[in-house]
UniProtKB/Swiss-Prot annotation:
One MF annotation (Gene Ontology) recorded for this entry: identical protein binding
Cofactors, names only: pyridoxal 5'-phosphate
Protein name: Constitutive lysine decarboxylase
Organism of origin: Escherichia coli (strain K12)
NCBIfam families for this protein: PRK15399.1, PRK15400.1
Alphabetically ordered keywords of this record: Decarboxylase, Lyase, Pyridoxal phosphate
Gene this chain is encoded by: ldcC
SUBUNIT field: Homodecamer; built of five dimers associated in a 5-fold symmetrical double-ring.
């Protein structure tokens, strides 16, 4: 952070000579100087180079207009205006709130001015650095001797071993020096919420529009459990999204509560839909409670917002309508919704308090923002028992939290403040929109087939597109008005083979083939469905990566149309079973898997599997207690009907539980098993395409086995 831009030269001695002296003095202070050609060049440079820490310009030539333009990009950036005795100073009180300083053109003053600019630069860096991160930086710079944990002592221990030196050189000194003990009192305590840790949480709450925020250093899986342990006491009833993350299924196993399920929709493509409006009504909840053994009126509700595939709820409507005192929005995938107007009313923290309710929102800061893995946040709006909540927080929080993770969460929040933050999110949205348009253009210009995108026919402007009733593109037959919206940064690519209504064509290209092709070229897909691939356009996606993905898709089309051999097109897949793939070509493989999917009627099978819920024989908590007592046995997956599952069973993708602990498949829900067996059959026919099924293990003979509770007697 040492770059200063100077606008000039001006072609007159009394201006250029003082600036020339100043340049030399600034270089002596450690600054790097650049000379933009004009204001357009300067603004482009600031937009794409956040390391710039100041701008020097002539007031007569640029005045407030340039200041206003720069403020739109970064209102904190120091601006240095040079004036002469005849300059007109038309500056209002509002204008003086800018980081704007004035200097006169004068020879012999360069060193003093450079020292002041160094001071203003230090103030700028201090101003944009959040409190805990600032304190951590200061502590590391002090290089204190410690006789406490961690044992590597700021990386010193690593340098006493050859392999340790490799580790130290890879991660770097500052990373290891910042890994400090909770014994460092000047950094406060994450568990007690004191000192810079408390300042960080208050800073984050203000940034995200929450009344209170908590930093969690071991993932939103833990954040979800913290909220649940506080909000759903033993013996209570919990209203929960069936599309929930497995961490919430684990919560149900830990906590002795009765789950009542909110049943979401999905379309023929396998894309996860939202929970219909009718499910949130009091009449619907009363029916569910009456049909569930031991259930009472729920004290807490959990809703996944957004869905994995990027569908956001009208959260304002849910908060007003859902008649429970506590609502938790699991927003792991959308920590950015507070920072762009298109997401207004679609996040847990949007809007004001709701009388008589407390709203929780958990976010995986690391998923779509610039934070280290496991960085997570809990936001709260409404009245709650802080002491009781903190007990739940401490119950799940290590007494040795990672301070680099804490600093990364806080820095992620700092990056979103002010105009720089708005621009950061807007750039992500615009880049995703541009990518969508490019795929559409290539599809229109392509000879024969090309990929499509799951979106409305017209996407001219950035917005959250409504999943409106009566429209064909989304494939949800009973969509509600003003209820669900597609996030533009969650891009789902469609491959040939099936349309949004589930109609299958004679030929198709299963998405798993495209995912393997891209993976072998260094492009990792977030999620793969039967004929769709999900890509996340986070703030870290730049034009180079977006163009690389486009190039990968066009290369796949070219290779597919040439009908290359598997050996040449997918060498890693070929290595899985060279004998099987020896003479096979890509079109043969694609049509083979496609025919297998058609044979089993995958679209219909998938819809039926998720539509009919298994029978709950006991709660997940009760089933877990049986399992840890050893009252379980292992059976083949084919024998699952009529047995009570000991574990949750979920295929990935989509990563949504099909069967919970304590649930049993019956004749009515037999299609769940048929769907699982169909997924297994693809891997049995084609090596390298085995399905990852959580809760089922494949033995050496290729048989999938699951754990069930022992039958009585």
């Amino acid at each position: 952070m040492n770059i200063i831009a100077i606008m000039g030269p001006h072609g007159v001695f009394y201006k250029d000579e003082p600036i020339k002296e100043l340049e030399s003095a600034l270089v002596a202070q450690g600054f790097q100087i650049i000379w933009p050609q004009n204001s357009v060049d300067l603004l482009k440079f600031i937009e794409h180079n956040p390391r710039i820490c100041g701008v020097i310009f002539d007031w007569d030539e640029y005045s407030l207009d340039l200041c206003s333009d720069i403020n739109q990009l970064n209102e904190y950036l120091p601006l240095y205006a040079f004036i002469n005795t005849h300059s007109t100073m038309d500056v209002s009180v509002q204008d003086m709130r800018m980081a704007l300083w004035f200097f006169e053109y004068a020879l012999g003053q360069a060193e003093d001015i450079a020292i002041r600019m160094r001071q203003y630069t230090d103030e700028y860096l201090d101003n944009i650095t959040p409190p805990f991160t600032k304190a951590l930086f200061t502590y590391v710079k002090e290089r204190k001797y410690t006789f406490c944990t961690p044992g590597h002592m700021g990386g010193t221990a690593y340098q006493k071993s050859p392999v340790g030196c490799l580790f130290y050189d890879f991660f770097g000194g500052n990373t290891l020096k910042a890994d400090v003990s909770i014994s460092v009192t000047e950094l406060g305590s994450l568990l007690d919420h004191t000192g810079p840790h408390l300042e960080a949480e208050e800073y984050i709450a203000r940034t995200f529009g929450a009344e209170q925020s908590y930093i969690v250093t071991n993932g939103t899986s833990t954040s979800n459990k913290i909220v649940g342990m506080y909000a759903a006491p033993s013996g209570s009833t919990l209203l929960i999204d069936r599309n929930c993350h497995k961490s919430l299924a684990h919560l149900l196993m830990m906590n002795d509560v009765v789950p009542v399920w909110l049943k979401p929709t999905r379309n023929a493509l396998g894309i996860l839909g939202g929970i219909p409006r009718r499910e949130f009504t009091r009449d619907s909840i009363e029916e569910k409670v009456a049909a569930t053994t031991q259930a009472q009126w729920p004290v807490h509700a959990v809703i996944t917002n957004s869905t994995y595939d990027g569908l956001l709820y009208n959260t304002d409507w849910i908060k007003q309508t859902l008649d429970v005192p506590s609502i938790h929005f699991d927003s792991a995938w959308v920590p950015y919704t507070h920072f762009h107007p298109i997401y207004q009313g679609k996040s847990g923290m949007s809007g004001e308090r709701v009388a008589g309710k407390v709203i929780f929102e958990t976010q995986s800061t690391h998923k779509m923002l610039a934070a280290l893995s496991q960085a997570s946040l809990i936001h709260i709006k409404g009245e709650y028992d802080e002491e009781a909540f903190n007990e739940a927080f401490m119950m799940h929080t290590t007494t040795s939290p990672s301070y680099p993770i804490v600093a990364s969460v806080e820095t992620a929040a700092a990056m979103l403040r002010g105009n720089p933050g708005k621009r950061l999110i807007n750039r992500s949205v615009e880049r995703a929109l541009h990518f969508r348009k490019e795929v559409q253009r290539l599809r229109e210009e392509s000879d024969g087939w090309f990929f499509d995108i799951w979106q409305p026919p017209q996407v001219d402007e950035a917005e959250c597109w409504p999943v409106a009733p009566g429209e064909q593109w989304h494939g949800f037959n009973d969509a509600d008005a003003d209820h669900m919206f597609l996030d533009p940064v969650k891009v789902t690519i469609l491959t040939p083979g099936m349309d949004e209504q589930g109609n299958m064509s004679e030929e198709g290209i299963p998405a798993a083939l495209v995912a393997k092709f891209l993976d072998e070229r260094g492009i990792v897909v977030e999620k793969t469905g039967p004929y769709n691939l999900l890509f996340l356009f986070s703030i870290g996606i730049d034009k180079t990566k977006a163009m690389g993905l486009l190039r990968g898709l066009t290369e796949f089309k070219r290779s597919y149309d040439l009908n290359l051999r598997i050996k040449n097109m997918l060498p890693d897949l070929y290595a899985e079973d060279p004998d099987f793939y020896r003479n096979m070509r890509i079109q043969d493989l694609a049509q083979g898997i496609h025919k297998l999917i058609r044979k089993h009627d995958l679209p219909g099978l998938m819809l039926r599997a998720f539509d009919t819920l298994p029978e709950m024989i006991m709660t997940p908590h009760q089933a877990w207690q049986r399992q840890i007592k050893g009252e379980v046995e292992t059976i083949a997956l084919e024998q699952l009907v009529g047995r009570v599952s000991a574990n949750m069973i979920l295929p990935y993708p989509p990563g949504v539980p099909l069967l919970m602990p304590g649930e049993m498949l019956t004749k009515e829900s037999r299609t769940v098993l048929d769907f699982l067996l169909m997924l297994c059959s693809v891997g049995q026919h084609y090596p390298g395409f085995e399905t990852d099924i959580h809760g089922a293990k494949q033995d050496e003979d290729g048989v999938y086995r699951v754990r069930v509770l022992k039958m009585a007697g």
